[in-house]
Amino acid sequence: ISQAGGRPDFIDIDERTYTMDPARLRQYLEGKCIWDSKRRRAAHKETGHPVTAVVPVHLYGQMAEMDAILDLANQYNFKVIEDACQAQGAEYFSQRENRWRKAGSMGHAAAFSFYPGKNLGACGEAGAVTTDDEQLAQTCRLLRDHGQSKKYFHDVEGYNGRLDAIQAGFLRVKLGHLNKWNEQRREVAERYNKLFAGAEAEVRLPHQPEWSRSVYHLYVVRVGARALLQKRLDEAGIGTGIHYPISLHLTKAYEGFGFRVGDLPVAEKAASKVLSLPMYPELTISQQERIAAEVLKSLEVTTGCGS
């Protein structure tokens, strides 16, 4: 956003889904913005910057609550750009349309990552943009290839964002397996849910609303004494991850924008407690049983571990 000349701002998350909270987005638009009748869009009261786009992140394999966000987009005249990098194949039931919609198909545009660790991963760096806007598609094609409209003719300053043929070939083959792999991830998640049943006070499990079909890019639990649990799992030979250890608005890259601790309390609290357990389609029942047993054993030793 900032590299494109805009000013980023952040909306807090829903405590259960970890995706953008539409109610907080509305609060931002109604409380921190005024209507700019000349531009026909909301503008920040203090900075004067217009709200031209909102980027909901489909996190951990689950889509954001798109209907509510799109309703606000229609009301306040901004574009919705989906960050679908972790949600290849995820679905959302749109009450507005009375049908299931895929991640990347609802906004004005969407970004996908094919980093090797994603549900659909290349063998190196790769990504894609989807849109129904032909003019935007042409702009993306131009920018990705050093701004060339044809070879050696540069219309604008662009960059090298080309997807090479080898990566595209791998992705084309793997795409045919994506639905099966996503279904296997759902089965792995369901087994975890059953293994941790009864321990929800110590291990808060991923929440999947009825309007969501997650593809479980990550299986993220929430615990109290995370560092100690992670250490004990590591000692048991079980790898874990933290996605993510710091809220983006508090990173050094954005310190010049004046964001402070407490601006996004839900996201900040989650960052201190979330822990990603092993998740991939081939994870076996016996492996999951061992992981769950080690987690529960560690939490029995650790007091005050509730989320």
Predicted regions located by residue number:
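Short, glycine/acidic-enriched loop or turn micro-motifs at the edges of active sites
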Residues: E15, G61, C85-Q86, P281
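PLP-dependent aminotransferase class I/II
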Residues: A23, W35-H49, A53-P56, Q62, ...
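Substrate-binding/gating loop at the entrance of the active-site cleft, primarily
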Residues: I1-A23, G117
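Short, Asp-centered acidic motifs that coordinate Mg2+ and/or phosphate
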Residues: T52-A53, K79, A109
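Adenylate-forming
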Residues: A111, A122-A126, G169-L171
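Conserved G/P- and acidic residue-centered "switch" motifs that form tight phosphate/ATP-binding loops
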Residues: G5, D83, D133
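Conserved active-site segment immediately N-terminal to the catalytic lysine
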Residues: E82-G121, K150-D155
